[in-house]
């Protein structure tokens, strides 16, 4: 894999999350306090045999992935866990909402274990149930709730998913967001009948899907800010909108800017830009291809030898793809 030194957006833990500039990249892991840690972990895994099933999310480091029985995105891994009813212990190497999803789909005799209970997703944390319920009540007060279907991204907490279920909504993934939106609009008679979607927690996935795949105008997408009264929107703006996007974002994909895309095209001959739909809209517009994590992986796998790619997604996945495809 070839790396190019380009001026990325500055990162840091102290940066306001609303800036979408991302979070600090922690760098290399420190040496294990126990030099025999890996050997002991592998021995324990072997001893437990089929009683143990380890799931590794694509975004994990190789030091973690080495223990995984299967790798994938959050939805794929949750389904894999459900398909292994004989596994007494399901260890999910991911973040909190992922383990929650697996726990929902697995049987009562299975234990889903999150190795680090503090492992969270900043985007999932941007849509809390009390905030969403307040927004729902505000939509009723504005006279538009009856036309709205709530749609949440897989990257959300279990209580947010349950809220959508209670209110006639649905959960989507980055792979099927367009299908989910089509279904949601149909529940209220379609776009021409004034149907609307309240989409959370990632505004960018919602906007990119609505505009680029559904043909909804950019000006028909408004952003609901849960930190402002009434979401910062007037009743007139809500009535005119087709997509009400929650003001949330991915702190990793928020790193990428259209300026970086321009710099890549100017400095790397024949580069193809491949990004995740959680990237900002102006980045997606300048990319050659956009798609889910699984789409990104399959695209690189199928790409011809010698092709040059710049991938706008999580670092560990990109580095792993580079190692697996050194000819590209």
Per-region residue spans from a language model:
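The feature marks the mature, well-folded catalytic cores of soluble enzymes
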Residues: 2-328
């Amino acid at each position: 894999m070839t790396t190019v030194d380009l001026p990325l957006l500055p990162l840091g833990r102290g940066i306001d999350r609303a800036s979408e500039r991302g979070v600090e990249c922690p760098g290399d892991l420190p040496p294990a306090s126990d030099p025999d840690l890996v050997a002991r972990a592998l021995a324990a895994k072997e001893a437990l045999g089929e009683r143990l099933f380890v799931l590794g999310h694509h975004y994990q480091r190789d030091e973690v992935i080495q223990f995984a029985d299967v790798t994938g995105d959050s939805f794929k891994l949750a389904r894999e866990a459900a398909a292994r009813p004989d596994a007494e212990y399901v260890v999910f190497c991911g973040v909190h909402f992922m383990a929650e999803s697996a726990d929902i789909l697995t049987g009562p005799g299975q234990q889903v274990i999150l190795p680090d209970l503090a492992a969270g997703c900043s985007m999932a944390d941007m849509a809390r149930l009390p905030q969403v319920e307040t927004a729902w009540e505000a939509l009723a007060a504005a006279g538009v709730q009856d036309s709205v279907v709530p749609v949440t991204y897989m990257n959300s907490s279990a209580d947010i998913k349950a809220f959508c279920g209670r209110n006639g909504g649905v959960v989507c993934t980055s792979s099927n967001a367009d299908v989910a939106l089509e279904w949601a609009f149909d529940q209220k008679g379609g776009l021409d009948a004034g149907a609307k979607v309240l989409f959370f927690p990632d505004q960018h996935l919602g906007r990119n899907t609505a505009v680029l795949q559904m043909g909804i105008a950019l000006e028909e997408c408004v952003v609901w800010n849960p930190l402002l009264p009434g979401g910062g929107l007037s009743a007139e703006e809500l009535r005119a909108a087709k997509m009400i996007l929650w003001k949330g974002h991915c702190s990793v994909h928020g790193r990428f800017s259209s300026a970086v895309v321009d710099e890549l095209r100017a400095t790397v001959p024949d580069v193809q830009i491949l990004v995740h739909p959680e990237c900002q809209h102006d980045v997606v517009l300048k990319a050659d291809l956009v798609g889910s994590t699984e789409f990104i992986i399959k695209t690189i796998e199928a790409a011809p030898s010698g092709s040059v790619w710049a991938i706008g997604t999580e670092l560990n996945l990109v580095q792993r793809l580079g190692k697996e495809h050194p000819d590209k």
